[in-house]
From Swiss-Prot:
Name by which UniProt lists this protein: FHF complex subunit HOOK-interacting protein 1B
Biased composition, class Low complexity, residue ranges: 482-496, 527-538
Known role: Component of the FTS/Hook/FHIP complex (FHF complex). The FHF complex may function to promote vesicle trafficking and/or fusion via the homotypic vesicular protein sorting complex (the HOPS complex). FHF complex promotes the distribution of AP-4 complex to the perinuclear area of the cell.
GO biological process: early endosome to late endosome transport; endosome organization; endosome to lysosome transport; lysosome organization; protein localization to perinuclear region of cytoplasm; protein transport
Alphabetically ordered keywords of this record: Phosphoprotein, Protein transport, Transport
Leader sequence residues: none
């Protein structure tokens, strides 16, 4: 993840001593101190004769006087820069400096030169010369000049003169910023000097002045090295303000620093390209190499990086003010409308920008304000998060960018994000049958879930070669419910940042003459594949590495992912295990109430204090907080009632004591454990649903008022442009609002997952990666919802197992209708493997990459965005990859060539126009790719379910934590 490390780079940009630029200074010939002092006094005596005249133009040769003073001053300051303290008094000033302080040399010369500004001739040139001389003196001096008051007063007088209305020029701006930068470096070495530059108010009631700071602020958003120097200098002052309450209060209360930063971000964002030139079909996020060449975006990222660094080091008053200004001056008025543009290209660009910002920010306070904006800010009655969730069901490009954004959000491991997306709908436990609630916390110790997932691999996607006799090993694989997998081991070096489902395409296979991999450690009991059999090794023209025996790699990758989530979630406020936070007790059976028990006035209070509650425990209000409820944000501004997942779950006011509820639940689970009770409950539910939810018993709630029905309709079908957005509703068709609902996020993910055959290969990679990312979380509610294949859900709740089963049936149906499906599948695997190997290649070099150690290869392997989800920029690489599997340019068919460009197996397509043939070719290509990805996704889910069984948040090895990359997780968002 790209993180901002401004401070680590700052030292290299601010050296201790600098060679002055452009002054044409000659290295003085050092003489003895007495001679230097004599020469210094001689120059000063000649200057004094000119200064003691009545005015700048009293003599006829006024211009000559100005030139003479400039030359003598240059000689004196050159000598003064080389002056050193005498050995007898090492802490005192040197002889030249002592003489200059006694005569107040700097102030007298500067005052005389500033008198020439009244005539308006050559002011810019003189000011630039003055700045250059003082900068040379400050940077080259061998004594701490700033400790002496006369030197500081002269510098402040010069900085004050720079605030007068003088025509600006590049030389003048460069000289001013350079001098200020050198002063900041000196002050950073001696922080006690900072408050000496803070001038008292010129008159009662006025604000104090810190010219060292205020003169830098106008350059904070400047381009090029000038702006970079100004930001570096300001950052040094920000770091010093943390230890100086006086300076911190000045910056927060008497300067425009924070408003300038926030409004500058808004102005810079308005100059960003509204349409991103997409480099390829697999593009889904902005990497550094994408935006570094765009000047407007590079300048914005530099300013955002600076804001991140300021919040990291500045005084708490400055931090809070800057965060508030960014939220209210940039996110709400600029990012909010930008994310809701009507043009699809603009929506793609704004979503990609937002994902880049979230991925680049490293300071928690700034990250929190971005998340607060996403979770709580409403635009046209919808939260930003609701809008982004809906876009997952849109066209391919907008869907990919949205999936990439949610991948970044989940990587933050923020409790409030997951609570808002999924957990608040699962906390009431209405998605499971009442008798199944105790099973939420069950751990699958025998691999039954893994066995179930692996059994969903379509038969047409399995390797059917005969296997050698299975060795008799005493291992877990021989136990009941253990997975048995046809597989063939493939060598790779696992990498935590690479999703394991991509390991299929990133192996070093025996393609194109590459060396054969060594044996891979095999778990006892896993079926040996024909590929690893000594009696038979397939040729490269056969199955590409067989890709069947990579389950051990998935297990390693899953263990890393689960451990990472466990460590990142340790600071969360609740384990979300079905008891904490406690679901609302319901004495009426499995048909729970769908309305909040809050009175209307309490709902209004909750709505008013919604954003403030985010500071204490995010969206989850603790027991000690006033309302005492788990507060999901309102939907479309309507406080309720909503589906069960969106209702408010009581934490403090309870109908039954907590101990009684636990006994009631335990007793209920025991009474309902029998098959009769369970079957009777299912029958009752079936009868109730067949009658439209109405039975002989009175309804549990009155019907929704018309205005609330309208609000609910507006939520389920948001008033956005229909084309690029929802291809499937957030709720299934004919689903009643009173039925259990697992949330729009899971609904749109499952709907997209169910249409895997229609998705592009890149959408499926991002989609399956997002689901696997969710499955790695250790919260029992989420883990059981996704991975517990024995859990019985409510009839209206679709499980992941059902979705995967539907995809399996579609793949098998497609394979049965496609005569050459095995050949298509083999070609698709070869293409994806070749694509992965090309993206791992060493950049633009034409020759083969030299062999290197595994550790070096592991250290440079790119991330997800740089692997398969990455366009092959090099024409050579693109040509190599396109030979394997690409749709025909003329629309005549789907080219499925093997290794040579001319060898292809055309797919027989129906007669019709070119557009119909191209559409059919695209449909076949997407379905074949899906048949490759789907089995690997099932292996990944199976491995994750087994990793959960052996991972405990209390038993993690600390040594393992040290060896793995650091994880930054967020609990509830704090102010």
């Amino acid at each position: 993840m790209e993180k901002m490390n401004w401070l680590s780079r700052l030292a290299s940009r601010v050296p201790g001593h600098r060679v002055p630029q452009g002054a044409s200074l000659q290295t003085p010939v050092m003489a003895d101190p007495e001679t230097c002092l004599m020469v210094f006094k001689n120059h000063w005596s000649q200057v004094v004769r000119i200064l003691e005249r009545q005015g700048p133009r009293a003599a006829t040769g006024g211009a000559d006087d100005l030139s003479a003073v400039r030359n003598h001053t240059y000689q004196m300051l050159t000598l003064l820069a080389e002056d050193r303290a005498v050995p007898s008094a090492p802490s005192g000033p040197g002889p030249l400096l002592e003489f200059a302080l006694r005569e107040d040399l700097l102030s007298r010369v500067l005052t005389w030169q500033l008198q020439w500004d009244e005539f308006g001739d050559g002011v810019e040139e003189r000011r630039a010369e003055q700045l250059k001389l003082f900068e040379m003196l400050v940077s080259e001096a061998r004594q701490p000049l700033l400790r002496h008051g006369p030197v500081r007063e002269a510098l402040l007088a010069l900085l004050d003169a720079c605030g007068r209305p003088v025509p600006s020029s590049p030389a003048l701006d460069e000289g001013l910023v350079l001098l200020l930068s050198q002063l900041c470096v000196c002050v950073a070495r001696e922080p006690s000097l900072l408050e000496f530059f803070l001038q008292p108010p010129p008159e009662p009631g006025a604000a104090p002045r810190l010219l060292l700071f205020s003169r830098l602020v106008p350059f904070v958003h400047r381009e090029g090295t000038l702006g970079q120097q100004a930001r570096d200098a300001l950052l040094l002052l920000m770091a010093l303000s943390d230890g100086s309450p006086t300076v911190g209060r000045y910056i927060a209360d008497h300067s425009y620093f924070c408003p300038v930063l926030a409004t500058g971000l808004s102005a810079l964002y308005s100059s960003l390209p509204r349409k991103i030139e997409v480099p390829g079909d697999d593009w889904h996020c902005l990497r550094r190499e994408d935006w570094i060449g765009v000047p407007a975006l590079a300048l914005f990222m530099s300013s955002l990086e600076f804001c991140n660094a300021v919040i990291q080091v500045a005084h708490p008053l400055v931090q809070k003010q800057l965060v508030d200004y960014i939220h209210n001056g940039f996110l709400v008025p600029v990012m909010g409308p930008a994310l809701h543009k009507t043009s699809v290209e603009e929506m793609i660009a704004s979503t990609a920008y937002l994902e880049l910002f979230l991925r680049s920010i490293s300071e928690p306070a700034l990250l929190r304000t971005f998340l607060r904006f996403l979770l709580l800010h409403r635009h046209d009655t919808h939260t930003i998060l609701d809008t982004l969730v809906a876009r997952i069901g849109s066209n391919s490009r907008l869907c990919m960018v949205s999936l990439s954004l949610f991948r970044t959000l989940l990587n933050l491991s923020c409790e409030d994000v997951l609570l808002q997306l999924v957990l608040r709908y699962l906390v009431p436990c209405n998605h499971v049958m009442l008798s199944q609630k105790p099973a939420v916390r069950d751990v699958d110790l025998y691999g039954r879930a893994a066995d179930k997932f692996l059994s969903l691999i379509p038969r047409c996607c399995r390797h059917h070669a005969p296997s050698p006799p299975r060795p008799e090993h005493a291992s877990w694989a021989r136990g009941p419910g253990s997975p048995s997998v046809d597989s063939s081991s493939v060598v790779t070096v696992p990498r935590p940042s690479t999703p394991s489902r991509l390991a299929l395409f990133l192996r070093q296979q025996s393609l194109g003459g590459s060396e054969s991999p060594g044996p891979v450690p095999r778990s006892p009991g896993l079926t040996a594949s024909p590929t690893s059999s000594p009696s038979r090794r397939p040729s490269p023209a056969e199955e590409p590495g067989e890709l069947e025996d990579n389950y051990l790699e998935y297990l390693r990758e899953a263990r890393r992912g689960v451990d990472r989530c466990v460590r990142a979630c340790r600071t969360w406020s609740a384990p979300y295990d079905g008891e904490r936070p406690p679901p609302e007790p319901n004495p009426l059976g499995s048909r729970t109430k769908k309305r909040s028990l809050l009175p209307e006035e309490d709902r209004d209070n909750v709505r008013e204090g919604e954003e403030e509650n985010l500071g204490s425990r995010g969206l989850a209000v603790g027991v000690g907080d006033t309302p005492g409820y788990l507060l999901p944000p309102q939907l479309n501004g309507v406080p309720g009632p909503w589906p069960e997942g969106a209702k408010k779950v009581r934490l403090v006011p309870r109908l039954v004591p907590q101990e009684g509820v636990r006994e009631l639940l335990e007793g209920t689970s025991e009474d309902m454990a029998g098959l009769e009770s369970f079957g009777q409950e299912l029958q009752e539910l079936e009868v109730a649903l067949s009658n439209g939810g109405a039975g002989s018993e009175p309804p549990l709630e009155p019907p929704l008022p018309p205005e609330e029905e309208e609000a609910y309709e507006s939520f389920t079908c948001p008033p956005e442009p229909p084309g690029p957005f929802l291809s499937s509703p957030l709720r299934t068709l004919h689903q009643l609002p009173s039925q259990p609902f697992t949330g729009p996020f899971m609904a749109v993910l499952f709907a997209k997952l169910e249409n895997m055959l229609q998705n592009s290969v890149y959408v499926n990679f991002l989609l399956t990666g997002l689901v696997a990312q969710l499955a790695c979380h250790p919260q029992p509610l989420l883990r059981s919802f996704l991975l517990n294949t024995n859990m019985v859900f409510q009839p209206s709740v679709k499980s992941l197992l059902q979705v995967l089963g539907s995809v399996k049936n579609k793949i098998e149906s497609f394979a049965a209708s496609q005569e050459d499906f095995p050949a298509l599948l083999s070609k698709a695997k070869k293409y994806l493997i070749a694509r992965g190997k090309l993206d791992w290649a060493e950049g633009p070099t034409a020759g083969p990459a030299p062999r290197r150690s595994d550790s070096l290869v592991r250290s440079r392997r790119p991330s997800l965005g740089e692997l398969l989800l990455r366009h092959a920029h090099s024409p050579t690489r693109a040509r190599q990859a396109v030979q394997v599997l690409q749709p025909g340019r003329d629309g005549t068919g789907l080219g499925l060539g093997g290794g040579s460009p001319g060898a292809s197996t055309p797919v027989l397509l129906p007669r019709g126009g070119a557009s119909e043939r191209q559409g059919e070719a695209l449909r076949v290509k997407n379905a074949v790719y899906c048949a490759v990805i789907f089995p690997e996704f099932l292996k990944e889910l199976a491995a994750i379910s087994q990793a959960h069984a052996v991972t405990s948040p209390f038993l993690l090895d600390t040594s393992e934590e040290v060896s793995l990359p650091p994880i930054s997780g967020f609990g509830p968002l704090n102010p």
